[in-house]
Amino acid sequence: MNNKNDELLLEIIQNKQFKQANIKELENLEFEWLIDDFLVKQTLVMIYAGAGSGKSYFMLYLSKYLLDSNKINRIIYFDADNSIKTLKERKGNEFLKTPNFYYYFSNNIQKFTLFKDMQKAKDLNNTLIVIDSIRNFIQDDFNKDFTMIKIFDELQRARDNGATIIFLHHQPKQNQDENNKAYKGATTFLDSVDEGYFLHKKDTN
């Protein structure tokens, strides 16, 4: 860039603090699988299912596995969906005995600014953040894309600061024998994540 217009454009870009793509960085970048063909480190992931499908239970076991196998250094689990009684019924004390498993009941009004504040943490490497469930942390209408884009921008910045983030989400109510695998809310929920998984409770009969 060598003329005045180019210099102005460069100044605008620099003031926006955008990061220029670096060829060497791209060539040296390797994907690190936390679980082969399922979970990549430093990604934003949605896991959604109907009520009673075992989303939270699944995340407790997954979290414990990742810590026990030294895939990550710590887990920060934010729960605004379940009660302490529910956690006890799920034998939560056995999961929480795992070192560096931090579990927080997040049921006050401060939860609505969690994502905005979380992005300020600059070093979240080797950290798994679990959001259970995301609808409980959103004060705005989560059916509207223009309100959800801001929420996901905040989550993406936390991911870019090193975190692996998994949030749990719900489905609309459906007939028991029918499931179209739809999730609640705006298309942003799937558009703005690295991966989205539908969790189905296997029939053991």
Whereabouts are the PLM-identified features?
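Intrinsically disordered, low-complexity regions of eukaryotic proteins
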Residues: 8, 81-83, 196-197
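OB-fold nucleic-acid-binding modules
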Residues: 18-23
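Walker A/P-loop NTP-binding motif
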Residues: 61-70
